[in-house]
Amino acid sequence: MAAPREPEVIRDKAAMRAWSRRRRAEGKTVAVVPTMGYLHQGHLSLISAAAAAASADPVAIVVTIYVNPSQFAPSEDLATYPSDFAGDLRKLASTGVVDAVFNPPDLYVRGAGRRGAASGGAISCLEEAAGDGHETWVRVERLEKGMCGASRPVFFRGVATIVSKLFNIIEPDVAVFGKKDYQQWRVICRMVRDLDFAIEIIGSEIVREADGLAMSSRNVHLSREEREKALSISRSLVDARTGALKGNTDCKQIKNKIVQTLTETGGQVDYVEIVEQESLVPVEQIDGPVVICVAAWFGKVRLIDNIEIDTRS
């Protein structure tokens, strides 16, 4: 285990780009772990994946901490998203492997014009607050539809845009994303492929609490009772995988069972979908690599989780 050390905090875009270029000139692989802060063990596992990403070359690890307003709709929880920058720095220092933290005050041009919808007709917290200052958006047209994209129409547009901006600023060789946000991971993979970013995207496995709850910064908002009820998500996913591996591969039956379980435990289901792992195309029968994706509300907290299944293995 590496000895604890303080990472350098960088807030300026030009300084961040220059830092990365110096590290690359030194023969290092630059790896980035994008986060919105309020770090937990799941985030630290992404850092471990970044540290292991370059076996041949030394690696310089950048963690970004930036709560991106363009991926939140005005009705969503931007204002209450948890934050503890000092605590985050302590956690990052404890790993001993993080070289820099990119924590910009803002990454968007702020306009003073009228409020209005940008391309696609969707309005985010950014547009509501800043008018038409920012006008350029990155969209992954098909993969952003359905699942989280159905109930959060600005989300993936905001994610793809901010990640593109971070990639252009940091110029990493490697970027690590958690597979808990499965659709987001696939959207980023497709964006990198389609736009010819010379970046390796690593998907890191879900990290769970001892009782199975997927780690999330939003878990802090759950009451004790809500948290106990929320365990029905991971338990229903494990049951579904167990059943599928035993031959229960009818997707309609599987989805209905998960919805029933979550509803009976007090959850409000946003969606349950079974899709091909790479294309995210819904399937009716499990006969290859699929992922079951779930989003549900417990109290005022929206939680997502998923489980990969391959009945061929």
Swiss-Prot record:
Pfam families: Pantoate_ligase. ATP binds at residues 36-43, 178-181, 215-218. GO terms for biological process: pantothenate biosynthetic process. One of its GO terms (molecular function) is ATP binding. It is found in: Cytoplasm, Cytosol. Beta-alanine binds at residue 71. The keyword Cell membrane does not apply. The keyword Cytoplasm applies. GO terms for cellular component: cytosol. Its main location: cytoplasm. The active site is at residue 43. Keywords: ATP-binding, Cytoplasm, Ligase, Nucleotide-binding, Pantothenate biosynthesis. It comes from the Eukaryota. Pathway: Cofactor biosynthesis; (R)-pantothenate biosynthesis; (R)-pantothenate from (R)-pantoate and beta-alanine: step 1/1. Catalyzes the condensation of pantoate with beta-alanine to form pantothenate. Essential for panthotenate biosynthesis. Homodimer. Belongs to the pantothenate synthetase family. This is Pantoate--beta-alanine ligase. It comes from Oryza sativa subsp. japonica (Rice).
